[in-house]
Amino acid sequence: DETIERVIRRELESRGWTIGTAESATGGLVGRRLTSLPGASATFRGSVVAYASDLKTSILGVPESTIDEHGVVSEATAEAMALGARAVLGVDVAVAVTGSAGPEPLEQPVGTMIVAVATPTTSMVRTLHLPGDRERVRAYAATGALHLVLRAILDS
């Protein structure tokens, strides 16, 4: 049974890389999925759930000017979260998610989720427009994040 989590772990192990997450709207779902397999500690180092904007700044090092200029739910903030997570967690690959999961919109329409991945050689950012209620949007965003992680690893 080849799950996305297994493929990511195999690709990380083959490179001797580690991974970590910086999550906001998904509340730790990406980290949960990456740690769902036994032996996850071989590649997974940790996760920061920075739900509050001040934590994005104080823990992940997202510049306040980025949040002021672009907003919390922006590609610039997501990329800064991923780059900050690489540094703070000491990982080769970091994935970050921010967004508006609902039920009330936050800067962007409900269902707007932004995923960023930073590796030693590249960074990728994608804006997803997802259907459904809050939990479905969060679950879809976690799946989208894992697919972007795999793509970024394979492109590195």
Regions of interest found by a model, annotated:
Residues 1-156:
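Short alpha-helical segments enriched in small residues
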